[in-house]
C-alpha cells in the first residue's frame, strides 16, 4: 500500500516538471503554452507535449491546418488559434481532442469546414468561428455538439442556413449570427433552443420576421435585429418572449408596426426603433413596461403620434423624438404618465407649436431639448411646476418673443439656450428681458441670442442690450419705436396694463386702430380760451382796482384840505 502511494507521488512530481519550451513559445503556466509566429502547416514540428490542457497560437503564417497538428492531445481543454490566416482545415484535424471544451478559430481565412470536423468534440461548450470567410455550413456540422453553450458565427459571409442546422443544440445559450449576409431564417431553425438567452442577428439583410420563428425562445433575454432590411414583422412575433429585456429594431426599413406588437414583452429595459421610415404608430403598441428606461424614435417619417402612445411606459427616464423631418405636431397629453422622465429630447423636428400641457406632470424632468424646430411661440405655462428642470434648449427656432414669466418658477434652472432665433427686441420682449437681467448666468456665451429687429437693435446680443440704457421705460412716454406686429398683440387679460400706457390706447392699438385725437385737440383749444379769458378778467380787475385806489386817495386828500380851511 505504501509503495503504491509513493509511486503515485513520484509520478505526479515527474508530471509536474516543466517540459522543454519551444523557442517561439511561452510556457509560464504548467500544462499551458502560448506561441506566435511560425507556420500553420508546421504546428506539429513545434514538439508540443501531448499532456497540455491549454494551447494559444496566434499570428502564424498562412497555411492549411494539418490533420496531425494536434495528434495525441487527448487531455486538451482549450485550443485558441486566432489571427493566423488559416485558409483550410484538413479532415480529422481535431479527432484526438475528445476533452476539448473551448475551440476558438477567430480571425482567420476559413471559407469551408469539413462535414465531420467537429464530431469527436462531444464535450465542447464554446465554439468561436467568427471573423472568417465561411459561405455555407453543412446541415450536420453541429450534430454531435450536445453540450455546446456558446456559438459565434458572426462576421462571415453566410447567406443561407439549413433549417435543422441547430437541431441538436438544446443547451445553447448564446448564438451570434451578426454581420453576415442572411436574408431569411427558415421555419424551425430555432425550434430546439429552449435555453437560448442571447440571439444576435444584427447587420444582416433580413427582410422579414415570420410568425412562429421565435416561438420556443421563452428564455431569451436579448434579441438584436438592428441594421437589417426588415420591412415587416409578423403580428405576435414577440408574444412568447416573456423574459426579453433587450430588443433592438433600429436601422431597418419598417414603415409600420403591427398593433400590440410589444404588449407581452413586459420585462423590456431597452428598446430601439430609431432610423426606420415609420409613417405612423398604432394606437396600442406598448404594454405595461415599468422597467423600460430609455426609448428613441428618431429618424422616422412620423407626422404625429397617438396621444396615448407612451401611456404604459411609466418607468421611462429618457425619451427621444428627434430628427423626424415631418413631425409637425404633438397631441395634448402625450407625455402624461411619464412621471419618472428625466430627459426629453424633441429636437430637430418640424414642430411649429406645443400644447399648453405638453410637459404637465413631468415633475422629475431635468433636461428638455426643443432646438432645431420651427417654434414661433411658447405657451406661458409650458414649464410650470417643473421644479427639477435644469437645462432648456430652444436654439434654432423661429421665436420672436417669450412671456416674461415663462421660466420664473424653475428653482433648479442652470442653463437656457436661446441662440439662433429671430428675436424682436421691442417692448413686447421687455418683460422677459427684465427677468433675464437678473439671471444672465443662465445664457450660454458660445452662441448668445441676438436681436433680429427692430432695425435700430439688429444684431445686438441680449448681453449688449441689457447693459445699455433702459430703452423701454416703465414710467414715462410711449415706446420710442413705432409699434410692431409683435408688439401689437393684445395683452393677457390677467395682467394689469403698464402704468405708462393708457388702457384704452392699448386696446385700440391691439386692434390695429389709430386712436382719434380730435377730442384732445378740442379740449386743448378750450383750455387755451379759458386761460385767455381768465387772464383778461384778471387784467380788467386789476385796472378797476387801480382806478378805485386812485379815487380813494384823491377823496382823502380833499377831506384833509377842507378840514384845514375850516380852522
From Swiss-Prot:
Pfam families, per the entry: LRR_8
Intervals holding LRR repeats: 75-96, 99-120, 123-144, 147-168, 171-193, 195-216, 219-240, 243-264, 267-288, 291-312, 315-337, 340-361, 364-385, 388-409
Source domain of life: Eukaryota
Membrane spanning residue stretches: 523-543
Extracellular topological domain: 17-522
Positions on the Cytoplasmic side per record topology: 544-567
Sugar-modified residues: 51, 181, 243, 298, 312, 385, 498
Region feature Disordered, mapped onto this chain: 474-499
Topology within the bilayer: Single-pass type I membrane protein
GO CC entries: cell surface; glycoprotein Ib-IX-V complex
Record keywords, A-Z: Blood coagulation, Cell adhesion, Glycoprotein, Hemostasis, Leucine-rich repeat, Membrane, Repeat, Signal, Transmembrane, Transmembrane helix
Domain LRRCT residue range list: 421-474
Example GO biological process: cell-matrix adhesion
Task of the protein: The GPIb-V-IX complex functions as the vWF receptor and mediates vWF-dependent platelet adhesion to blood vessels. The adhesion of platelets to injured vascular surfaces in the arterial circulation is a critical initiating event in hemostasis.
Protein name listed in UniProt: Platelet glycoprotein V
Encoding gene per record: Gp5
